[in-house]
């Protein structure tokens, strides 16, 4: 039987600095003792996006105090923690260095094992913390850096069924917002404007709809938005609302097709499974209510459970990093050496095909 375990998690892969303490009992039940997140929204809003150097400096300034706060809120000392888990990739290399080096230093000083966690694995396993979900299941990750459909077979066992061939969905939201003069972050701003818009005014493209493969593409949709805005310039607030509503509708229809095909494939490959199949959604874009509604209806139609963890666990956080570390410990996985290096590009499925367009450095994730 797996013993009781407690772990300190650290997350610094992008523009949130986070620390958390999570414990797991012998039966696999989780308890979050603390969850501290410091957003860098104010630091980056003037630039309309994340500036890597500013992000790294902000992590340096905040991380030590956040870790201390996480331990204090959990009412535990480092001596009462069994291991350290720190995000090691993928993400912005400066931020990853800050978090991983801090994790290494704590592990060495306190004599604790270190687990270098793949950020995407944190997202992939969160539903097991919140809902006790059994393997296998599908996960749709939709964020500023990633759009992927992943089969989660087990801890450390992932198969990428689909990914974006160009822009991530969150990136498309942010760039559309910037184009229309909306504030950063773009996703919530586009969603707010869309509530007062006409979703049928603009017939935006729905990339890859109808294709058998399960990949995504959003670059062409972003270009179509730019062209529509130029064609009717100068644009009014109502024009912006209509563009946002039409943009969201195109994305909803695209996801309905792409994910619908994924659900059918899952049912075919796991026809003998007695458990009701599940689709998990994670990432900041998962907060969008229209997209959630589309996915919920799609799951209802296909006999799937739709699982969306609480928003604070969908976006970047250290709870998921701690939990991923606990899951690895529970399988008996060995800790990482203290000379482990961060990886800005770290595909969750190491056997996945590299798509055209990623360049010499390969796929980020």
Swiss-Prot record:
Binds 1 Fe(2+) ion per subunit. InterPro entries: ATPase_NBD (IPR043129), Gcp-like_dom (IPR000905), KAE1/TsaD (IPR017861), TsaD (IPR022450). GO terms for biological process: tRNA threonylcarbamoyladenosine modification. Keywords: Acyltransferase, Cytoplasm, Iron, Metal-binding, Transferase, tRNA processing. Its cofactor is Fe(2+). It catalyses: L-threonylcarbamoyladenylate + adenosine(37) in tRNA = N(6)-L-threonylcarbamoyladenosine(37) in tRNA + AMP + H(+). Its main location: cytoplasm. The keyword tRNA processing applies. Its EC number is 2.3.1.234. It is found in: Cytoplasm. This is tRNA N6-adenosine threonylcarbamoyltransferase.
